Amino acid sequence: MVRWFTAIRVRLRDLRQSTFFMNAFYLMLSTFIVAGFGFIFWVIVARGYSSTTIGLATTLLSVSGLLSMLSLAGFDTTFVRFLPKSKRPNDHINNGLVVVALLGVVLSLGFVSTLSVTSPSLIFVQHNGWYIFGFTFFTVATSLNVLTNAIFLAQKRVRDIFIINLLFSAFKVVLPLLIIHGSVMTIFVMVGISQLVGLVLSLGVMKVRFQYTFSPKIHGDIMRLTRKYSFSVYASSILNLLPPTILPLIIIHRLGSSSAAYYYIVFTIGSALYTIAYASMQSAFAEGSHNEAAMRNHILKATKLIGVLLAPAIVVVLAFSNVILKIFGSEYATGGSGLLRLFAISAVAVAACSALGAIFKVTHNLRGVVAMNIVYAAGILGLSYVFIPKFGILGVGWAWIAGTIAAAMVGWAFLKRSNSNYKLREG
């Protein structure tokens, strides 16, 4: 017995000394904290707002999320890949912050100007100057907050991400307790304020940790150095984000705002499963960016970690999906439990795509990562459009499973054909 406890203690000590496992642990914990507090946030909101109001708010948040991700222009992945060995980290960071902020403003205003065509249900935003300002401002704040996370990951300071996310997520939960009733924009602004708090905290920590100093100057030589890589990962990121952000628009158009609310809540919960794979492979990506020669070992470690954690998590969701969703109300359990189970089943294919994506980004297999995400986006969105009239909201889940499996198969084909230095089976 003593030997057994000693062995466990030694193993835990080894894990604490491994930057890969600690970064993966903090990434998972950070995402679970955000998801957990987000879960509480929506439980509170669901008690004070109608499902129609929540459906419109979640659609607006989804669009804002898409625009904030589009604003990143690939800088988040580029930071993780190039910052570790950069001799001018401040210039890299300032390039990213300035370009992302400017692009965020342009995209947000562009979207608002086309609401009558792209999303008539959100046209109310266009009719109020403060709504336009709030939508633009908080979309930019969200994109910059996400970008700062990439900076901490690149420097292997993931513990800071966890602390910052814990603080701004806790703050987010307090807001609906203070503002019990309101409109669609009330919900949107509450989420936006929490993102702004996270951004301010991140910039403060960057100043202390990395002696970061902001400058609005764009350094063209650095932009030219990374533009091909940035453009390719930007394209793949756009494709990867299209399904979760465009699906609410399809659902609200074909099934109504209540179904959009069910989808948003279900996907928020289902994303917690995907976090296991995403966090593990992001940690492998960060470690591989510091030391490409060790990439194979990190991928294998990540795969083992995913296997240990993901299987029981899937079983729990499959068994208790109805119970979980009843927390939001019986209508959510009735309307979304089947979809949640399908999202859980797709987690295995999502993990495979995450692993392949990490390999492609480190080895600069840019065609592979773009092709895989083309199949992913086209498969999920195209099949959802076909399946929804036949299966209702469950059609989204079946499309998600088929699309991710197809994407993983395409990614595997590119890996097998790759001439990069990384070979999955080589030691």
Place the predicted regions along the sequence by residue.
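Interhelical loop/hinge segments that connect adjacent transmembrane helices in multipass membrane
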Residues: 4-17, 159, 163, 187-188, ...
